[in-house]
C-alpha cells in the first residue's frame, strides 16, 4: 500500500461523508457544466484530485463502457473508498492512479476532458499543475474548473461579528499556508500560458435559509474548521467555541440568510 498523503481536513470516514454531502449540493451545477463541455458517451475524462470519487462515479456513468475515467488522487484511503463505491455500482471504466498532481507526471495523454474542483486553491504553484493537465488534453479537449473567486462573499443576515471574523481569519490562515482562496482571479489570466482558450465562465453563488440543503454544505465545514484553527494555534479554543455557538444561533433562526463563497466555473479548450 502506498504511503497515505493526508489533507488539511483529513481522509477519515467523517471527511468522506462530508465530501459526499458537498458533492450532492454541487452536483446539479457539475452535471450542467459537463453537459455544456460536451462530456458524453465515449469520452475519456481525467478527474484531477478525485478525492473519494463522487465525481468519478458520475462521470463513469455518463461516459459509459465505451468511455473511461482516469481518477488521479494522492490519498490511498480515498482511492480505496472510490474502488469500493465503483464495485458496488458495477462500474469497470474507472482507472485510479495514486499520484500527487504537484510532484508527479500526469499518467495520460490525448484525453477529451479534465475535471478539477477546489484543488488549485491549495497549491503554491497552480500554473505548473494547470500546464500539466492541459498537456494531457487532445487538441480541442476541454478543462472544466470550479474554483473560488471570492471566498469573502460568505456572509450572514442578520450580521454576526464573530462569524465575519471567522471568514477573515480563515482567509488569512489559508494564504499563510501557501494557498489562495480567491484563486480563480489568478487562474483566468493563466489559461493562455497553459495553451488554453477560454470558452465560458459562470459565477455560482447561493443565498439560502437554514432549511435549504445548500446550508448543510457550510454547516459541516465551519464548526470543524473553527476547531482545526484552534488546534493549529491560530485562534484560541474559546474563540472557536464562540464561532460554533454563533453559527448554531444563525442556524436556529429560520429567517437567517447566508450567502456562500463565490465559485467561478471555467470551461477552456486546448488550442
Predicted regions: what they are:
Residues 144-212:
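Conserved catalytic/acceptor-binding region of the Class I
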Residues 105-113:
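A short acidic, Gly/Pro-enriched loop at the edge of an enzyme's catalytic core
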Residues 112-127:
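A short SAM/SAH-binding and catalytic strip from SAM-dependent methyltransferases
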Residues 181-182, 192, 199-271:
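Conserved Class I S-adenosyl-L-methionine
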Residues 127-142:
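A short glycine-rich, Lys/Arg-flanked "PGG" loop and its adjoining helix->strand segment in the class I
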Residues 24-44, 58:
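Conserved alpha-helix/loop element of class I SAM-dependent methyltransferases that forms part
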Residues 1-16, 20-21:
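N-terminal, positively charged/glycine-rich alpha-helical extensions of SAM-dependent methyltransferases
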Residues 46-48, 52-104:
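Class I SAM-dependent methyltransferase SAM/SAH-binding core
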Amino acid at each position: 500500500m502506498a504511503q497515505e498523503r493526508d489533507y488539511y481536513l483529513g481522509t477519515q470516514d467523517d471527511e468522506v461523508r462530508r465530501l459526499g454531502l458537498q458533492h450532492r449540493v454541487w452536483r446539479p451545477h457539475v452535471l450542467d457544466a459537463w453537459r455544456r463541455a460536451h462530456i458524453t458517451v465515449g469520452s475519456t475524462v481525467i478527474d484531477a484530485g478525485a478525492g473519494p470519487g463522487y465525481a468519478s462515479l458520475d462521470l463513469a456513468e455518463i461516459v459509459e463502457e465505451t468511455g473511461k475515467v482516469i481518477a488521479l488522487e494522492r490519498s490511498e484511503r480515498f482511492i480505496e473508498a472510490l474502488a469500493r463505491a465503483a464495485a458496488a455500482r458495477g462500474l469497470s471504466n474507472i482507472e485510479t492512479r495514486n499520484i500527487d498532481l504537484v510532484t508527479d507526471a500526469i499518467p495520460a495523454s490525448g484525453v477529451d476532458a479534465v475535471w478539477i474542483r477546489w484543488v488549485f486553491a491549495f497549491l503554491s504553484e497552480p500554473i505548473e499543475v494547470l500546464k500539466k493537465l492541459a498537456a494531457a488534453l487532445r487538441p480541442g479537449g476541454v478543462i472544466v474548473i470550479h474554483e473560488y473567486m471570492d471566498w469573502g462573499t460568505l456572509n450572514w443576515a442578520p450580521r454576526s461579528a464573530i462569524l465575519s471574523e471567522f471568514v477573515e481569519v480563515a482567509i488569512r490562515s489559508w494564504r499563510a499556508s501557501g494557498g489562495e482562496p480567491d484563486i480563480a482571479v489568478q487562474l483566468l489570466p493563466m489559461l493562455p500560458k497553459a495553451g488554453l482558450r477560454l470558452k465560458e465562465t459562470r459565477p455560482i453563488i447561493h443565498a439560502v435559509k437554514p432549511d435549504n440543503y445548500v446550508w448543510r454544505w457550510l454547516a459541516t465545514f465551519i464548526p470543524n474548521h473553527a476547531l482545526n484553527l484552534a488546534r493549529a494555534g491560530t485562534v484560541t479554543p474559546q474563540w472557536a467555541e464562540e464561532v460554533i455557538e454563533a453559527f448554531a444561533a444563525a442556524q436556529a433562526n429560520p429567517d437567517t440568510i447566508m450567502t456562500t463563497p463565490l465559485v467561478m466555473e471555467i470551461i477552456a479548450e486546448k488550442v
